[in-house]
Each structure stands twice: as structure tokens, then as C-alpha cells.
Amino acid sequence: GGDGRHGRLHIDVGAAVIERIAGQEGDDDGRLAIAIIVEQIIELSRSMFPVRFMGFPAYTYFALKIMDEKGIHLKLKKGSKIMLGGGWKNHYSEKVDKETFYRLAERVLGIQDIDIIEFFGAVEHPILYCDCRYHHFHIPRYGRALIRDVDTLEPLSYGQVGLLNLLTPMVYATPILSVMTDDLAVLREGETCPCGNKSAYIEIVGRVGLHDIKTCAAGAENLIKEALK
């Protein structure tokens, strides 16, 4: 909905950015593409409309860091938001804490942490964990989470670090009601969060083995190449 010019603006800019990025050889981690996106952010900052960002935390952080290092500090229109999902993947060793990310976003774009929304989930576990006002991933009623000991796989109590095990009865197509992730996490009691949601929440603290981490797409690409040999 809204002003038709707004919709056309997004379509035109999106097509232009995709065309430019597709024509670049770039380095493997996509930082050349990020430089192109930074140009577009600067251009969009002159618009009368708010800007909405959707993407991986890692690449969003890299773009903000580039802008900060170059002294590019903008004040985007009210209503601008950042929506994050997908984790840090193979850039996990460069991950920064949330407070550092929020301060950088406010300094570079003028977007406060209340307008930064993050999602957590897994391809094999079709339940979306949306962060609350205090950026905690509360467990929805149609999902469950266990923290398991990394050696024995025994369930752990609140406050203990272990492997994150996600469960839901909402999967019908394949027998994957229980998914063991490679995320290290802590389960916190919901009452400790001031947002009012009493459901327990997940705090992601790391990943098991930072070497050879691949995205889902990269893993699928390798499997296809092997199958075609």
C-alpha cells in the first residue's frame, strides 16, 4: 500500500543494485558488493521515505563499519528499520555483541535499537523466533528448546551452556521433529526479561567449531557438484 512512487522507488533501486552486483567479480566474502550497497544507502538517505533493511547481521555490520570508517553518518527518516536474520555463518569469528551493533547502527544511520528486529530459526525447524523489545528470543508456544551437554547430550538446566536442541510438532513433510543444532546456547527463565513474556528465552553464545562452517546454499552447491561428477 501507500504512495505508488514509494513502491516504484524500491523496485527501481533494487533492480539497479542487483544488476551492478551481478556484474562484479568481487572477493569471496562479498565486500565489493557491500561497497555498492553503501552507495545506495547514501542515495536513499536523501529520499523523503524511511528505509528498511533486511539481511544477514554480518553483512549489515560490514556495511555499517565501512560507512563509519569513511565518516559517513546519516540520519534516516523516522520509521526506518533494520531486520536481521540468518546469523553470522562463516563470519562468526568476526561477530560483535548486540550492544556494539546497536550503537554502530545509531551512529551511522540514526536508527535506534527499538527499530532493530532480529529473527532466529533453522531451515529444518520451521518456527520463527522473533526477538522482543529487549532482544531476547522467547520460545513460541508451538516450539520447545532444550540445552544439552556437549559430551553426554543430557538436558541441562537454566543458565548452563550447551548444544541447542529445537523441537516442534509442526513438521509434517519429513520426520525431523527434533533438530540438534551446532549453536551453543543458554536457556533463561522468561520472568527475567522485563518485556512481560513469561516464556523462556534462548541466548545464543557461540557455535561448535568455527572451521569449515558453510551456509545452507554453499553446502547444497557442493552436494550438487559431487552428484554431477
Feature locations, PLM:
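Active-site glycine/GP-rich loop and adjacent strand/helix microenvironment
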Residues: 2-229
